[in-house]
């Protein structure tokens, strides 16, 4: 029996563990660990014990295997999954630095310049066989009490590895998912193919007045607020694609990704958000201090803009979102966000930046 370690105990981690338990039965053991600084979900699940996976194609009870000790969690694991937001990835990597990871593969699910962060933090001699990054998570999902809902299973999603994997290793990795995997040529393409910074910030900024005025219940995020901001969403997506073209990377439009992942009959992006059932019950954040701004803007879009400037691409829509988000958070995100300088790439040219995003 093979083993995977899942670092994080949020919606994705628990859904992934339940999926492995129900779909792969006794073939794979999934062990969950969470940082000691953020164990609310971890401890709550421990108190519940057995959870119920509720999915579109299969469901059933499973008992997550929780491990308090990081060393024990990753011991003999062929694959180690980071299932935490960008903000938490670096902290976990700094805890992993004390261990020899040279016989494992590290996966950021999803990735966010994780290959670059690994290179900056992990010792070369103890680094993983490869780092794999994905554009998105395999599912739209959330846990409510003891029920873990797979709201939508993506038909496929995109991944890239920093090193060439053997056929056997690739097959074992792909078998962990119910989805088809599309392999991109490099992790840099994955970083710029994350559509969260395109969709989330415009939606929550449109919702600002309703959130701050305490409206209850709030309209649903994808049903109401994202469609209301669709012009800005589209502007951001167009700028994202311009950066990709300038850097010679690969990607697709945000709407193409939505259709590829979830299917449906929508003919344009606004219609997709208004009609896709997997998003129907996704609520709107009740505070503006939310990862839609603190992660998607501060830690991803700011870096996109800095790279765009080096590549000679004009991104006025992104800059306006960053400024507006900064006003909401009372920060100058161009100063406090994740920057080229903070990633040891100050003064780098586009070729060096792409190389670094690929973990080199």
UniProtKB/Swiss-Prot annotation:
SUPFAM superfamilies to which the protein is assigned, alphabetical: 6-phosphogluconate dehydrogenase C-terminal domain-like, NAD(P)-binding Rossmann-fold domains
Asked if the keyword Oxidoreductase belongs to this entry, the reply reads yes
Please name the Gene3D superfamilies in this protein's record. N-(1-d-carboxylethyl)-l-norvaline Dehydrogenase, domain 2 (1.10.1040.10), NAD(P)-binding Rossmann-like Domain (3.40.50.720)
Please indicate which superkingdom the organism of origin belongs to. Answer: Bacteria
Give the enzyme's main class according to its UniProt record, as a single word.
oxidoreductase
Q: What Enzyme Commission number(s) appear in the record?
A: 1.5.1.-
The question of whether Oxidoreductase is a record keyword is answered with: yes
Keyword vocabulary terms for this entry: Crown gall tumor, Oxidoreductase, Plasmid
MF-aspect GO terms: oxidoreductase activity
Give the similarity note. Answer: Belongs to the lysopine/nopaline/octopine/opine/vitopine dehydrogenases family.
Kindly provide the name given to this protein in its UniProt entry: Vitopine synthase
- Which organism is the protein's source? Allorhizobium ampelinum (strain ATCC BAA-846 / DSM 112012 / S4) (Agrobacterium vitis (strain S4))
What lineage, starting at the top, does this entry show?
Answer: Bacteria, Pseudomonadati, Pseudomonadota, Alphaproteobacteria, Hyphomicrobiales
